[in-house]
UniProtKB/Swiss-Prot annotation:
This is Nucleoid-associated protein plu3840. PANTHER family: NUCLEOID-ASSOCIATED PROTEIN YBAB (PTHR33449:SF1). Binds to DNA and alters its conformation. May be involved in regulation of gene expression, nucleoid organization and DNA protection. Homodimer. It is found in: Cytoplasm, Nucleoid. GO terms for cellular component: bacterial nucleoid; cytosol. NCBIfam families: DNA_YbaB_EbfC. Belongs to the YbaB/EbfC family. InterPro entries: YbaB-like_sf, YbaB/EbfC. One of its GO terms (molecular function) is DNA binding. Its main location: cytoplasm. Residues 1-23, 89-109 are annotated as: Disordered.
């Protein structure tokens, strides 16, 4: 059922995977990603924990209406959040690739 090495080998692999996941989560938390809107007129930088680190607004937008600026900031934040999610998925995809898991076994992520 568990292939060569039995349950002990599976437990060892699970521990190794847990260690890799811990390191990967620390790496992801330190990442910074910038989202943009309005063709780069508004930029929002967030970290892997989705905390906003920086907001950059092109000076030309200060003359426009408040609602448009608010929409651009929200769109830039959403773009940054989408980018960090994609980066997290890419980094986590390789964690379980070396494990010999039973057929049909699904990881919790």
């Amino acid at each position: 059922m568990f292939g060569k090495g039995g349950l002990g080998n599976l437990m060892k692999q699970a521990q190794q995977m847990q260690d890799k996941m811990q390191k990967m989560q620390e790496e992801i938390a330190s990442l910074e990603v910038t989202g943009e809107s309005g063709a780069g007129l508004v930029k929002v930088t967030i970290n892997g924990a989705h905390n906003c680190r920086r907001v950059e607004i092109d000076p030309s937008l200060m003359e426009d209406d408040k609602e448009m600026l608010e929409d651009l900031i929200a769109a830039a934040f959403n773009d940054a959040a989408r980018r960090i999610e994609e980066t997290q998925k890419e980094k986590m995809a390789g964690i379980s690739s070396g494990m010999q898991l039973p057929p049909g076994f699904k990881m919790p992520f």
